[in-house]
């Protein structure tokens, strides 16, 4: 072994020498050509500061300190005006793109399941003028069907171009749009449609057949269903009195002269634009009421943090458009002339589950420059790439590590490593098309480990944001020059953020070295409250003496000296154990989620017990290999139910917990392995892959009793 190391040291000596020479020759011209000094100064500067010396005062961005921004494009104070501005400016430029489905094949998997595989063609684009024509026709058609201004219309549909066309129609014709996640279960969909009293519903044939058909008898108000696909359905299978139309037929109706001649009833800034139903991570979905002015303000803040946003950019849309992050990102891209190519998590990359082997995924074909991702997706990319690295031979692995560590060191200094990008990371970067210049992360905290990996291997900054549905997605976003990790950036120019003492959790604005407390966001981007839920609105929202709205987030934050915010806890995730210790379940999960053997984890604790337990979705490939090494045989379910495999997972949990310096009482001491992954379709996680703790608790109730010594 010693001889091997000595030989390796000799072999790698030229590599280290090359890096030293490269650094000496390239650094000085690169430093001046890329304006690295200015970028470093930008990264280190104060980005936000409190409005007064009083503890608990709101923090504001230093670039918009005297007043908060409420509008981006002069005169465009409603969403329809943003749309008109974009159409007038970018008329014949490509706008919305969809890939052609060339063929579909059923493929038998080793476990006996049949997966549908797709062979897809190139993207087909419609330009801004064509989008405008479809919006006008669809709006006139809905009006001809009897939909009145300020009457709600719901959309329960997958992310696609028709979703955006329908949304822009509703904004222009002043139809408040009720949005529902396509993965919601029957009970949640029925609740949202009945509570909103929507009489018109936009959906897809697949969702109509698989989810809505069985729920129609429980839905009170829906009289018209519009499906977006170019397919046919058997109307005889649906209740009498329910009118079903294709989107194409509604557009054709609207194009008739007697209908198209009627101008739309335009909205005002104080009109309702959206009632956005949440994913229900903490219970029944709530409808969040957003006025046009709320969304305009929020997007004003978000766009300011994306430098150079414009017609040269291509955005890949695959996250749920019912999620505020995706919706505001796409509207912003449309406004600034960026192409939007539509995708899905199942077709995103060449390795995605619906892409036939040998075919190209959407990123490879589209080559986006901008994309948004939730941490769960970035964690998967990180684990997949690092798994490939582990399969390399010793020299390849060592070379990768040298290059990775070298670039990481440069990034921490605010520099880059172009040679490493070209030689080492080009193939990794190609997984997302090769052209991504910035990624937006939101929906949950991104682990520092994954954040650093994305910076290094994908050669682009990560704009880590913090916002909520209730704040129209706007709160904070890290600047592209800020390469620190574990933080979510300074307040956007549209809002201010203050911290409020939470005595029970031990967080106060007087804490040293930095103030800590519950995060409260204020500004015009704060939504108007919860639909038909005045009690919850009064609990979470407030209005100050100046008429400004504030929202209490329930998240715990810490402000750093440069004005950047760090999310450190969540009130609802805190459990007091029997002996009096407080455990933050989210903190435990974040510390353990990047374990190679773990794909997902949920920590659980009860106040009448003295220890933490966990539910884990193991990595099937790695755990199966480990089972073979340990002589454990059987199916995947058998492996997950094997006590020896549970012990191996617990061993890895302990090692990771110690490395992350978790307290003894925070470390799970029992585990239940789940052979089935947690997906939005199972109802155990949201579309942003946040854990649904209540549903997980109910799902594993018997296991909880067993692990806590019950029957």
Swiss-Prot record:
Positions in the Cytoplasmic compartment: 29-711
Catalytic activity: a long-chain fatty acid + ATP + CoA = a long-chain fatty acyl-CoA + AMP + diphosphate; (5Z,8Z,11Z,14Z)-eicosatetraenoate + ATP + CoA = (5Z,8Z,11Z,14Z)-eicosatetraenoyl-CoA + AMP + diphosphate; 15-hydroxy-(5Z,8Z,11Z,13E)-eicosatetraenoate + ATP + CoA = 15-hydroxy-(5Z,8Z,11Z,13E)-eicosatetraenoyl-CoA + AMP + diphosphate; 12-hydroxy-(5Z,8Z,10E,14Z)-eicosatetraenoate + ATP + CoA = 12-hydroxy-(5Z,8Z,10E,14Z)-eicosatetraenoyl-CoA + AMP + diphosphate
InterPro entries (alphabetical): AMP-bd_C_sf, AMP-binding_CS, AMP-dep_synth/lig_dom, ANL_N_sf
Family matches, as Gene3D superfamilies: 3.30.300.30, N-terminal domain of ligase-like (3.40.50.12780)
SUPFAM superfamilies per UniProt: Acetyl-CoA synthetase-like (SSF56801)
Modified sites of kind Phosphoserine: 447
Membrane topology: Single-pass type III membrane protein
Cellular-component GO terms for this entry: cytoplasm; endoplasmic reticulum; endoplasmic reticulum membrane; lipid droplet; mitochondria-associated endoplasmic reticulum membrane contact site; mitochondrial membrane; mitochondrial outer membrane; mitochondrion
Record family assignment: Belongs to the ATP-dependent AMP-binding enzyme family.
Protein name: Long-chain-fatty-acid--CoA ligase 4
Lineage: Eukaryota, Metazoa, Chordata, Craniata, Vertebrata
């Amino acid at each position: 072994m010693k001889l091997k190391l000595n030989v390796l040291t000799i072999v790698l000596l030229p590599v280290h020498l090359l890096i030293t020479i490269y650094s000496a020759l390239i650094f000085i011209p690169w430093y001046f050509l890329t304006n690295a000094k200015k970028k470093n100064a930008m990264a280190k500067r104060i980005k936000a500061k409190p409005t007064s010396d009083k503890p608990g005062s709101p923090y504001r961005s230093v670039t918009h300190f005297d007043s908060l921004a409420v509008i981006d494009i002069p005169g465009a104070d409603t969403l329809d005006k943003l749309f008109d501005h974009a159409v007038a400016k970018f008329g014949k430029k490509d706008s919305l793109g969809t890939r052609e489905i060339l063929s579909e094949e059923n493929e038998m998997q080793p476990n006996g399941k049949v997966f549908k595989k797709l062979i897809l063609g190139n993207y087909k684009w419609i330009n801004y003028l064509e989008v405008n024509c479809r919006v006008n026709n669809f709006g006139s058609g809905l009006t001809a069907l009897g939909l009145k201004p300020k009457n709600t219309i719901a959309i329960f549909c997958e992310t696609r171009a028709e979703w955006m066309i329908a949304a822009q129609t509703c904004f222009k014709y002043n139809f408040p749009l009720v949005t529902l996640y396509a993965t919601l279960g029957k009970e949640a969909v029925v609740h949202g449609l009945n509570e909103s009293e929507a009489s018109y519903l936009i959906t897809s044939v697949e969702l109509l057949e698989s989810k809505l058909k069985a729920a129609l008898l429980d839905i009170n108000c829906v009289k018209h269903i519009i499906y977006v696909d170019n397919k046919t359905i058997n109307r005889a299978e649906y209740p009498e009195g329910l009118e079903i139309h294709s989107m194409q037929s509604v557009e054709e109706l609207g194009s008739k002269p007697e209908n198209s001649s009627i101008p739309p009833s335009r909205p005002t800034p104080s009109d309702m634009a959206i009632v956005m139903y949440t994913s229900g991570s903490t219970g029944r979905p709530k409808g969040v009421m957003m006025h046009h002015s709320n969304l305009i303000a929020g997007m004003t803040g978000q766009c300011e943090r994306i430098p150079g946003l414009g017609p040269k950019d291509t955005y890949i849309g695959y996250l749920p458009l019912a999620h505020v992050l995706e919706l505001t990102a796409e509207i912003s891209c449309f406004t600034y002339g960026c192409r939007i190519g539509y995708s899905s998590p199942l077709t995103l990359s060449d390795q995605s589950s619906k892409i036939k082997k040998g075919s190209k995924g959407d990123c490879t074909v589209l080559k986006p420059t901008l994309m948004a991702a939730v941490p769960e997706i970035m964690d998967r990319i990180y684990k997949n790439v690092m798994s490939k690295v582990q399969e390399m031979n010793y020299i390849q692995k060592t070379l990768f590590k040298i290059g990775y560590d070298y670039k990481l060191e440069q990034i921490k200094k605010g520099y880059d490593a172009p040679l490493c990008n070209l030689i080492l990371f080009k193939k990794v970067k190609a997984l997302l098309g090769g052209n991504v210049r910035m990624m937006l992360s939101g929906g949950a905290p991104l682990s520092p480990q994954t954040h650093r990996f994305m910076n290094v291997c994908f050669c682009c900054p990560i704009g880590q944001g913090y916002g909520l549905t209730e704040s129209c997605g706007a709160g904070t976003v890290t600047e592209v020059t800020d390469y620190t990790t574990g933080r979510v950036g300074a307040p956007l120019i549209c809002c201010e953020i203050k911290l409020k003492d939470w005595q029970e959790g031990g967080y106060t604005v007087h804490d040293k070295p930095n103030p800590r407390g519950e995060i409260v966001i204020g500004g015009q981007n704060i939504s108007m409250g919860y639909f038909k839920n005045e009690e919850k609105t009064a609990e979470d929202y407030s209005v100050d003496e100046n008429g400004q709205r504030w929202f209490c987030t329930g998240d715990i934050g810490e402000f750093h000296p440069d004005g950047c915010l760090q999310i450190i806890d969540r009130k609802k995730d805190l459990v007091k154990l029997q002996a009096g210790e407080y455990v933050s379940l989210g903190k435990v999960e974040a510390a353990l989620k990047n374990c190679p053997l773990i794909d997902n984890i949920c920590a659980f604790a009860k106040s009448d017990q003295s220890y933490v337990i966990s539910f884990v979705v193991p990595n099937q490939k790695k755990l199966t290999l480990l089972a073979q090494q340990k002589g454990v045989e059987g199916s995947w379910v058998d492996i997950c139910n094997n006590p020896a495999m549970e012990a191996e997972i617990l061993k890895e949990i302990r090692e990771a917990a110690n490395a992350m310096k978790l307290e003894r009482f925070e470390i799970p001491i029992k585990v239940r392995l789940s052979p089935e992954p947690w997906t939005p379709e199972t109802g155990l996680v949201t579309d942003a892959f946040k854990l649904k703790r209540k549903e997980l608790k109910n799902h594993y109730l018997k296991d909880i009793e067993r692990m806590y010594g019950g029957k």
